[in-house]
């Protein structure tokens, strides 16, 4: 079952790369709701299809988790392209701040009440994990590692106030739909 879910995403990698390109990004940007061809099936009026980017990291994390459980290096070699392309997406999706850190701007996180937010904690943490997993996979396979993967994974911002992870930059206790920081 798990492999068939991963095969579904891998078989539609070209469409994810096309979606990233349409939005001006590199790599692969997986749809929030994918149809059978890999096209975005979310209605255009729903911002989740356009802005809920953490699904791309979720896909990459699932690929790495499958490898860690199976230790199937042949499978990993064949599917490394998914980890690489999603890492390339995140590197192209971030913006560099004046202090040298990185941010991901204008997203919807798992908390779908919070739209057009910057540095959503779940999105950023998932992107960090996806980048680190791409590095681990590349190391395992002796594949080249883009130095930007490491730089972004180490400097992507997660906002905290008084030791508490904030849902997103500027979060001040607004009502939430899903407590996405609990997913970290």
Where are these regions (language model features)?
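Aromatic- and histidine-enriched alpha-helix N-cap/loop-to-helix transition segments
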Residues: 1, 50-61, 78-81, 119-129, ...
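Carbohydrate-binding/catalytic loop surfaces
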Residues: 23-49, 101-122, 164-176
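A structural signal for alpha-helical segments
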Residues: 70-78, 115-118, 122, 144, ...
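Helix-terminus loop motifs that line ligand-binding clefts
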Residues: 2-61, 67-77, 86, 91-101
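Short linear motifs at secondary-structure transitions and domain/linker junctions
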Residues: 35, 80-83, 160-163
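Acidic/histidine-rich catalytic neighborhood
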Residues: 85, 89-141
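Active-site core of glycosidic bond-cleaving carbohydrate-active enzymes
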Residues: 1-12, 56-61, 65, 132, ...
